[in-house]
Amino acid sequence: MSHAELLAQWSAEKQIRRCMHQYMQLCDVLGPGSDLDELMSLFAADATWEGLGKRYKKTFGRYVGCAAIRQMFAGYTREPGHFLLNIHFLGNEEIHVTGDTASANWLLMQPSDFVDGRSQLSCARLSVTFVQRHEKWLIQHFTTENIFSRPMAARWDNTAELPVPDSND
């Protein structure tokens, strides 16, 4: 692989990583009043978003095309909201670029507090294909498959004071 090819591959990987990072940041704050335009700008017009496996296929289903994907996300923007706290941590990244397409995998850890008082920790395997259109990498096919989900006895965001060392020692 030439230096130019290697540089192009690294640049593509960085842009794909940035696209996924932006997707997760927007999902972290998705709630009433959220503008879905920025989130939808990360998807190709003919994109697919789907849940896989026994749990997520039933819970999330499959959405084809930006209009269907937008409608699915719109459910999270209605009052009174769904999440009080929602954080997406990605790890175990793997990205493979081939020309103007790429495939990528991540593990997702997601602690969530819900408006209805419940809290949960979920782990999922994300498999995402990307396509480069007009110099921009876009999500072509997003899949999420549950590895585990665990209800939590207490909220993640506890209002108790944080323990710190005594400064008088």
Which ranges hold each PLM region?
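Structural motif corresponding to the C-terminal cap of alpha-helices
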Residues: 27, 77-80, 112
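A solvent-exposed, acidic/Ser-Thr-rich amphipathic alpha-helical stretch
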Residues: 36-107
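A beta-strand edge to alpha-helix "cap/lid" segment located at domain peripheries
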Residues: 3-6, 82-169
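Short, charge-rich amphipathic segments
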Residues: 1-9, 58-68, 162-164
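Short beta-strand segments enriched in hydrophobic/aromatic residues
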Residues: 27, 43-44, 51, 108-110, ...
